[in-house]
Amino acid sequence: MKSKFQKIKGTYDILPPESKKWNTAISILQSLSEQFGYEEIKTPIIENIDLFKQNIGYETDVSKEMFSWEDPSGNQLVLKPEMTAPVVRAYIESGFFRSKPLCKLFYIDALFRREKPQKGRQRQFHQFGIEALGSSEVEQDVEVILLATKILCHLG
Protein backbone atom coordinates (compact mmCIF):
# COMPACT_ATOMS: atom_id res chain seq x y z
CA MET A 1 0.00 0.00 0.00
CA LYS A 2 1.43 3.37 -1.00
CA SER A 3 1.50 5.91 1.82
CA LYS A 4 0.07 9.38 1.41
CA PHE A 5 3.34 10.66 2.89
CA GLN A 6 6.57 10.05 0.99
CA LYS A 7 10.10 11.16 1.71
CA ILE A 8 11.10 14.30 -0.15
CA LYS A 9 12.76 13.68 -3.50
CA GLY A 10 16.53 13.71 -3.09
CA THR A 11 16.45 12.47 0.51
CA TYR A 12 16.72 8.96 1.89
CA ASP A 13 16.01 6.84 4.92
CA ILE A 14 18.77 4.78 6.53
CA LEU A 15 16.97 1.60 7.56
CA PRO A 16 18.13 -1.66 9.14
CA PRO A 17 20.35 -3.45 8.28
CA GLU A 18 21.98 -0.48 6.51
CA SER A 19 21.81 1.60 9.72
CA LYS A 20 24.07 -0.92 11.47
CA LYS A 21 26.68 -0.58 8.69
CA TRP A 22 26.25 3.20 8.88
CA ASN A 23 26.94 3.25 12.64
CA THR A 24 29.96 0.96 12.22
CA ALA A 25 31.43 3.31 9.60
CA ILE A 26 30.84 6.33 11.85
CA SER A 27 32.56 4.56 14.76
CA ILE A 28 35.59 3.82 12.58
CA LEU A 29 35.77 7.44 11.39
CA GLN A 30 35.50 8.78 14.95
CA SER A 31 37.98 6.31 16.43
CA LEU A 32 40.69 6.80 13.81
CA SER A 33 40.29 10.59 13.84
CA GLU A 34 40.66 10.64 17.63
CA GLN A 35 43.74 8.37 17.43
CA PHE A 36 45.33 11.08 15.29
CA GLY A 37 44.43 13.77 17.83
CA TYR A 38 41.39 15.21 16.07
CA GLU A 39 38.41 16.32 18.15
CA GLU A 40 34.82 16.22 16.95
CA ILE A 41 33.01 19.47 16.21
CA LYS A 42 29.26 19.91 15.76
CA THR A 43 27.91 23.14 14.30
CA PRO A 44 24.29 24.30 13.92
CA ILE A 45 22.30 22.96 10.99
CA ILE A 46 21.16 26.53 10.27
CA GLU A 47 23.66 29.32 9.56
CA ASN A 48 23.57 32.89 8.30
CA ILE A 49 23.61 32.86 4.49
CA ASP A 50 26.43 35.44 4.35
CA LEU A 51 28.82 32.93 5.94
CA PHE A 52 28.66 30.93 2.71
CA LYS A 53 28.09 33.65 0.14
CA GLN A 54 31.12 35.66 1.31
CA ASN A 55 33.38 32.65 1.79
CA ILE A 56 32.59 30.43 -1.18
CA GLY A 57 31.41 33.13 -3.55
CA TYR A 58 28.11 34.38 -4.85
CA GLU A 59 28.26 32.62 -8.21
CA THR A 60 29.44 29.14 -7.19
CA ASP A 61 27.27 26.06 -7.68
CA VAL A 62 27.04 25.67 -3.90
CA SER A 63 25.76 29.24 -3.50
CA LYS A 64 23.15 28.68 -6.19
CA GLU A 65 21.99 25.39 -4.62
CA MET A 66 21.44 26.50 -1.02
CA PHE A 67 18.14 25.98 0.78
CA SER A 68 17.63 29.50 2.10
CA TRP A 69 14.84 31.62 3.58
CA GLU A 70 14.21 34.78 5.52
CA ASP A 71 13.09 34.40 9.13
CA PRO A 72 10.44 36.68 10.71
CA SER A 73 13.21 39.01 11.96
CA GLY A 74 14.59 39.51 8.45
CA ASN A 75 17.67 37.30 8.89
CA GLN A 76 18.74 35.41 5.76
CA LEU A 77 19.28 31.80 6.85
CA VAL A 78 20.42 28.64 5.13
CA LEU A 79 20.61 24.90 5.79
CA LYS A 80 24.34 24.08 5.82
CA PRO A 81 25.52 23.19 2.28
CA GLU A 82 29.14 22.47 3.30
CA MET A 83 31.24 22.27 6.47
CA THR A 84 34.48 24.24 6.14
CA ALA A 85 32.91 27.70 6.57
CA PRO A 86 30.94 26.74 9.74
CA VAL A 87 34.01 25.03 11.23
CA VAL A 88 36.17 28.12 10.65
CA ARG A 89 33.39 30.37 12.00
CA ALA A 90 33.22 28.27 15.20
CA TYR A 91 37.04 28.21 15.46
CA ILE A 92 37.19 32.01 15.33
CA GLU A 93 34.05 32.72 17.37
CA SER A 94 35.10 30.35 20.17
CA GLY A 95 38.60 31.84 20.43
CA PHE A 96 40.26 28.49 19.70
CA PHE A 97 42.68 30.34 17.43
CA ARG A 98 44.12 32.01 20.56
CA SER A 99 44.24 28.97 22.85
CA LYS A 100 45.07 26.23 20.34
CA PRO A 101 47.80 27.17 17.86
CA LEU A 102 47.03 23.91 16.03
CA CYS A 103 43.37 22.97 16.21
CA LYS A 104 42.60 19.53 14.75
CA LEU A 105 38.88 18.99 14.21
CA PHE A 106 36.70 16.40 12.48
CA TYR A 107 33.03 16.33 11.61
CA ILE A 108 30.35 13.95 10.41
CA ASP A 109 27.22 15.87 9.53
CA ALA A 110 24.16 16.12 7.31
CA LEU A 111 24.33 18.80 4.63
CA PHE A 112 21.76 20.13 2.19
CA ARG A 113 21.84 21.38 -1.40
CA ARG A 114 19.00 22.12 -3.77
CA GLU A 115 20.44 19.90 -6.49
CA LYS A 116 18.55 18.01 -9.13
CA PRO A 117 18.37 14.52 -7.58
CA GLN A 118 20.19 11.93 -9.68
CA LYS A 119 22.51 8.99 -9.14
CA GLY A 120 25.18 10.08 -6.68
CA ARG A 121 23.49 13.45 -6.05
CA GLN A 122 21.06 13.95 -3.19
CA ARG A 123 19.51 17.02 -1.63
CA GLN A 124 20.47 15.72 1.80
CA PHE A 125 23.82 14.00 2.17
CA HIS A 126 26.33 13.24 4.89
CA GLN A 127 29.93 14.33 4.91
CA PHE A 128 32.97 13.38 6.95
CA GLY A 129 35.93 15.71 6.99
CA ILE A 130 38.91 16.89 8.97
CA GLU A 131 40.32 20.37 9.36
CA ALA A 132 43.77 21.16 10.78
CA LEU A 133 43.58 24.87 11.51
CA GLY A 134 46.61 26.97 12.40
CA SER A 135 49.32 25.01 10.61
CA SER A 136 50.96 25.46 7.23
CA GLU A 137 53.48 22.67 7.85
CA VAL A 138 53.84 19.97 5.20
CA GLU A 139 53.90 17.37 7.99
CA GLN A 140 50.27 18.22 8.68
CA ASP A 141 49.39 17.40 5.06
CA VAL A 142 51.25 14.09 5.37
CA GLU A 143 49.28 13.27 8.53
CA VAL A 144 45.98 13.97 6.72
CA ILE A 145 46.99 11.64 3.88
CA LEU A 146 48.03 8.93 6.37
CA LEU A 147 44.71 9.24 8.22
CA ALA A 148 42.77 9.04 4.93
CA THR A 149 44.73 5.91 3.98
CA LYS A 150 43.98 4.24 7.34
CA ILE A 151 40.29 5.12 7.04
CA LEU A 152 40.06 3.65 3.55
CA CYS A 153 41.84 0.47 4.69
CA HIS A 154 39.46 0.05 7.65
CA LEU A 155 36.31 0.75 5.65
CA GLY A 156 37.39 -1.52 2.82
Predicted regions and their residues:
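TRNA-recognition modules of translation machinery and tRNA-sensing kinases, especially anticodon-binding
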Residues: 1-156
